[in-house]
Amino acid sequence: MENIPVTKTFHHTTYPAIDPTSPANSAAGKTVAVTGGAGGIGYAISRGFCKAGADTVILLARRQHVLSEAAAKLHAEFGTTVWTYTVDIRDAASTSATFASIRKRLSEDSGEDEDVDVLVVNAATLHQGENVIEYEPEIVRDSFETNTIGNINVVRAFLTPEIPAIPKTPFLSGITFGKKKEIAGVKAPGRQKVILEVSSVSTHILFPEQSLYSASKLASTHIFRFLQTEIDKLPGSPVRIHSFHPGAIRTPGLADVTGEADMNSFEWDDPSLPEGFAVWLSTPAAAFLKGRLVYANWDVEELIAMKKKFEEDPEYLTITLKC
């Protein structure tokens, strides 16, 4: 993939600064949940957090046999506690019940009110190969129900303890649409949480015959930016959201919809790239990137050196209209 020149260095595999085994990137004491965590990019990211020493890694997906196989492999390799939950993120009630069950289980084990620390929003569906107006309505609907609405369902379930305390943001000074929200006396838990959205280069680059995937992923990433501005109103800004393109990773899901000749003609990035980058992005060192869309390929040390640019331009590396 052609480099968008944000950093001079464009990585295709892991490197020391994002190494999950580095003490600087430790996930010790953390509980991490990954949607679509049993295969492809999600599995690579789950593996990264196991490498980084996370206490518990929770895999969420639709097929139990795939979840069981992935969990067994991760536990055998790293000794990490791995939980699995079958859930269809398109089902809001089921997704909320799943996270309620996770919170209950974590709290029972520790005797305190516990929750997931890092949520990786990765599950997605890819429909491609047709012109825009040739997709059947059910295919259009499925793309948005998974890639956009499904992601909202997951984050709503994850942030259930925080939601009552999030104030409404006025459209204009003194103007708020909808019902008034009463938050007086409502206290947010204050637990530090991180949301990592696995976004895509196709949110801002036109790829032929990928209109549905591109549009639904774009909608998701843009909604996450709105959400960051809303939850920043909580005291202490306890939740940060990062959207990132994981690199060009050859996955079984992509192979299912792409011809073998096309797959073999492309220069792919190594799964170790998103594996390490996601772990680094969850650390305090990456806090200045919250609300932005970044590439896993970009060099993190060069990004850190650009911190002042991010502070001076709140729209830098966001999806917006620049004139």
Which role does the model predict for each range below?
Residues 117, 125, 133-152, 170-176, ...:
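Catalytic Tyr-X3-Lys loop
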